[in-house]
Design a protein with these regions (language model features):
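Conserved alpha/beta core of the MobA/IspD/sugar-nucleotide pyrophosphorylase nucleotidyltransferase superfamily
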Residues: 2-3, 186-270
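Conserved core of the sugar-phosphate nucleotidyltransferase
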Residues: 138-221
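Phosphate- and divalent-cation-binding pockets in alpha/beta enzyme and binding domains
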Residues: 77-80, 140, 240
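Active-site acidic Asp-centered loop
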Residues: 131-132
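A short acidic, often aromatic-flanked loop/helix-cap motif at beta-alpha or helix-coil junctions
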Residues: 98-104, 161-163, 192-194, 260-263
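A structural signal for short hydrophobic beta-strand segments in well-ordered beta-sheet cores
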Residues: 41, 174-177, 254
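Conserved N-terminal catalytic core of the sugar/cofactor nucleotidyltransferase
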Residues: 1-5, 14-33, 45-127
Length: 270
């Protein structure tokens, strides 16, 4: 089955970015963008082009043709950007993540993906990929996850290649893969003792940077029935993935990758 659809998650409120304090002598303009602009639209080069620009170029180079951009129910910035910027060869569609008036924020990444599929039901019968809007994945990584023959898969990054501070790297959840490379578990906030038990067959610690491929007919029900995380009060994509793995072992393959992934989580990342 051809896989040329990429869903980009961009409906978060960027809370960590707005709350963070910069140690990098950012310009007044950069700080203003960080406090007021969706992360994917923050300028990252001298010409003012945002991260989403380069992510879309890499996606096109990787063979994607249809982009589903998931934005918040009040978001206007992305629509304004794409009214002024055309990406030939890419069909860009908008999905809206709505949330109940009793909530102060969206219901999480699993809910964002669920709402996207309900708004575009064709995705139920397709293979598609999913990624964050605030990570700049390489065209090589995007092509690898797009073209894999596994129904459900993700890029399994070698932690040693991520060029972040030790504090930031240690904050990433780590993955447990079986000897054949299939996902068995995801551990958030690991301790030093956990690392030894989560090494893969080559002795590597693997982390997930939210670059996935899913089969819609397989994964939709797990999104629909994803529970809220008790601490964060959100429906999180890794929870839905783990529920799939528990029900169907050897169903989600980790594609090993060794490279850095530029990331915009806090002001220090700009």
């Amino acid at each position: 089955m051809i896989n040329d659809s990429l869903i980009i998650l961009a409906a978060g409120l960027s809370s960590r970015m707005k709350k963070s304090v910069s140690n990098n002598n950012l310009s007044k303009n950069s700080i203003e963008q960080a406090n007021n602009t969706e992360k994917g639209l923050i300028s990252i080069d001298k010409n003012g082009r945002p991260l989403i620009h380069y992510l879309l170029l890499n996606a096109k180079s990787a063979g994607f043709k249809t982009i589903y951009l998931v934005i918040g129910q009040k978001s206007k910035s992305f629509k304004n950007y794409f009214n002024k910027n055309i990406y030939d060869g890419l069909d860009i569609k908008f999905a809206i993540q709505y949330f109940d008036k009793n909530r102060v924020k969206p219901s999480g990444t699993a809910d964002a993906l669920y709402q996207t599929i309900t708004q575009f039901p064709v995705l139920k019968s397709l293979n598609f990929c999913v990624c964050n809007s605030d990570n700049l994945y390489s065209s090589k990584a995007l092509n690898s996850v797009r073209s894999t023959s596994f129904l459900n898969a993700f890029i399994s990054y070698d932690r040693d290649y991520l060029n972040f501070s030790t504090e930031k790297v240690n904050s990433f959840s780590i993955l447990k893969l079986n000897k054949n490379g299939y996902l068995e578990d995801i551990l958030e906030k690991p301790t030093a003792k956990d690392y030894e038990f989560f090494k893969d067959k080559n002795g590597k610690i693997r982390v997930n940077m939210n670059l996935f491929k899913f089969n819609g007919s397989v994964f939709f029900e797990y999104l629909k029935n994803c529970p809220f995380d008790k601490l964060r009060n959100e429906k999180e994509l890794p929870t839905a993935v783990l529920n799939l793995v528990k029900n169907q072992p050897n169903s989600v393959y980790g594609i090993p990758f060794e490279e850095h992934v530029p990331d915009l989580t806090s002001k220090n990342d700009i």
